[in-house]
UniProtKB/Swiss-Prot annotation:
Name under which the protein is recorded: Uncharacterized protein TM_0508
Start and end residues of each Macro domain: 416-599
Domain of life, per lineage: Bacteria
Residues that hold ATP according to the record: G49, P50, P51, G52, S53, G54, K55, T56
Keyword Transport part of the UniProt annotation: no
Entry keyword annotation includes Nucleotide-binding: yes
Source organism: Thermotoga maritima (strain ATCC 43589 / DSM 3109 / JCM 10099 / NBRC 100826 / MSB8)
């Protein structure tokens, strides 16, 4: 065969370490393969990585550097009989102190019984086995063989790596490509050097003696330029946010389009595993199982069929109840200092440790009905509440368990923790950390929107805890009166809540501060108090209206709350209201009001 007749992938196949592009952790100066082969030795190993990442090219290095006989077999071409012949050859050579290395391409094509033939020969040292696979070794290689081999992970080649290979190839082919064509071919190759070289060969054969334009390339290969790195992140972001927004229609659209434009399905599967914990969490613990199972299915099935697995998972995650309580617990711990572990929780491994008090006083919960009431946190952190479940899905059940186990942290019948108490003209004003839906007051305030649609945030929690009657009464108000203007407040019953009424007040959406937001927030607070006064109530609890998803700056809101409450009391000295509570469940908002609020 002449040079011109050889495939481009063969012409450019690396012959020495310096010829390899990418995989520096393997072929670089400090790479494990380079250091080993330079001594003439090699260990049994599995070369695992995506197509076109350089695995098969290792054979040329083995032939050059390995101090022994090297045999190449492909599992797609050669059967067990040929493998057994090589194993016998290795057994004979070992008797004479010589070595044989079997390079077995695509070992995942062998079934488990065929793979077991290799085990004893690798164990005895009859052969050194170097096998390649594009499939996860944990799934496709029998444990007995896998335990006797080291896995070398080949990474997907970067765009920069592929561009270097492309430049070499265009010199060999003497082909002239526009820069946009080079970039498009690199993107089209998806980290696969073999795919890149095959594409270049097709282009060369179709457009000899011509400068190749992007239009030429797309005529030959179709759309190869549509999915840039920027659009990769844009589509991925839209996909995640659509699932977070519980919209399966949008989520499936972005998912399928990403795959059509060449996205790696494993990337999407990984993102869904993260999403299952970060955005669904313990509201539906099954979400993580489904996401992990989907990732395994993607590895086993591959495209195009695994797209169905991905779509199924995306729909499930989109419709699952949402909670970020796990994520928030993680973030809270990351902000806390490192403290010493209490002595009673330390394991007394030695007598000296016992003398120092390690393990002293520890009570084994299983000997006490499954639960021992004690402080397990470091002493300085004993009052911290790290995990705060949302009142949604399975976390509702977890919350009830926590209330029974740790009433001092999760409130028993009430979650309220009074952080600050003030008095103004005989009226009590309290800054409280807790769940407003459990407040034992005459009325709680809901931070509502103009159409009284109580879907998320505090509004959603109030409806879930109080029942559908709250939303039904709200809908009737809007049907009879129209939308509720920003700054105004209306009243419904409280359903199953401990409070008698819910006062729905509409706070402003923050738009920079130049659209009357301060005045509207003042009115929202004032009118909520006014509705309670009109009903001759004695106590009211309200959240930090507009400071959540409406984005009103919290520190700015404190002063407005203070003025509205003070003005209301001044202007209604005969009010029946005796207690005004500002209740928030999150620590940040509570702390800001605790530190800044004054009358």
């Amino acid at each position: 065969m002449s040079i011109s007749e050889k495939p481009l992938s063969e012409l450019l196949r690396p012959k020495d370490f310096e010829d390899f592009v990418g995989q520096d952790h393997i072929f670089g100066n400090k790479g494990i393969l380079r250091r080993t082969l330079k001594t003439g030795n090699m260990f049994s190993s599995i070369l695992y990585g995506p197509p076109g990442s350089g695995k098969t090219s290792v054979f040329s290095l083995l032939k050059r550097y390995f101090n022994g006989e090297v045999v190449y077999l492909s599992s797609t071409v050669h059967g067990v009989s040929e493998i057994k012949n090589v194993l016998k050859r290795g057994e004979q050579l070992r008797k004479y102190g010589k070595k044989l290395l079997l390079f077995l391409d695509e070992i995942h094509r062998l079934n488990k019984n065929q793979q077991m033939v290799l085990v004893s020969h690798v164990e005895r040292g009859d052969i050194v086995l170097v096998a390649t696979t594009t499939e996860n070794p944990s799934f496709v290689i029998v444990p007995a063989l896998l335990s006797r081999c080291r896995i070398l992970y080949f990474k997907k080649l970067s765009d920069e790596d592929l561009m270097k290979i492309l430049k070499k190839a265009t010199e060999v082919l003497n082909i002239d490509l526009e820069e946009s064509v080079e970039k498009a071919i690199v993107r089209h190759s998806e980290g696969d050097a073999r795919k890149l070289l095959n594409t270049l060969e097709i282009v060369h054969q179709a457009f000899k003696n011509k400068r190749v334009t992007l239009e030429d390339l797309e005529t030959l290969l179709g759309n190869v330029s549509g999915y840039t790195k920027e659009s990769h992140y844009d589509f991925a972001s839209a996909f995640i946010k659509s699932m977070r927004g519980s919209d399966p229609n949008a989520a499936v659209y972005y998912l399928v389009k990403m795959i059509e434009m060449g996205e790696d399905p494993r990337f999407i599967a990984r993102r869904m595993i993260i999403f299952a914990s970060e955005d669904v969490g313990l509201a539906d613990p099954n979400a993580l199982h489904i996401a992990v199972s989907t990732s395994i299915a993607v590895e086993h099935v591959g495209l195009p069929e695994c797209l169905m697995n991905l779509v199924e998972c995306a729909v499930y995650l989109s419709l699952a109840p949402k909670s970020n309580s796990v994520y928030l617990a993680m973030k809270k711990v990351q902000e806390l200092p490192v403290e010493d572990v209490p002595l009673f929780l330390r394991n007394p491994v030695t007598e000296e440790m016992k003398k120092r008090g390690y393990g002293e006083g520890y009570l084994y919960p299983h000997d006490f009905g499954g639960f021992v009431k004690t402080n397990y946190l470091p002493e300085k952190l004993k009052n911290e509440v790290i995990f705060q479940p949302k009142r949604v899905g399975f976390e509702e059940e977890l919350f009830e368990r926590l209330r029974k186990l740790w009433p001092e942290k999760y409130g028993g019948e009430s979650m309220a923790e009074v952080r600050k108490e003030l008095e103004y003209k005989g009226k009590k004003i309290r800054i409280v950390k807790g769940d407003i839906t459990r407040e034992e007051v005459d009325a709680i305030v809901n931070a509502a929107n103009e159409y009284l649609k109580h879907g998320g945030g505090v509004a959603g929690a109030i409806v879930r805890a109080g029942g559908s009657v709250i939303q039904e009464e709200s809908d009737r108000i809007v049907q009879e009166r129209g939308r509720v203007p920003t700054g105004e407040a209306v009243v419904t019953s409280a359903g199953k809540l401990k409070a008698k009424y819910v006062i729905h007040t509409v706070g402003p959406v923050w738009r920079g501060g130049s659209h009357g937001e301060d005045e509207l927030l003042y009115k929202a607070v004032y009118n909520a108090l006014l509705r309670a006064h009109e009903l001759k109530l004695k106590s009211i609890s309200m959240p930090a209206i507009s400071t959540g998803i409406f984005g009103f700056p919290k520190e700015r809101a404190v002063g407005i709350f203070s003025k509205a409450i003070r003005d209301f009391i001044d202007q209604h000295p005969d009010t029946t209201l005796e207690e005004i509570r500002i209740c928030n469940i999150d620590e940040e908002t509570t702390k800001i009001f605790e530190e800044k609020f004054s009358v």
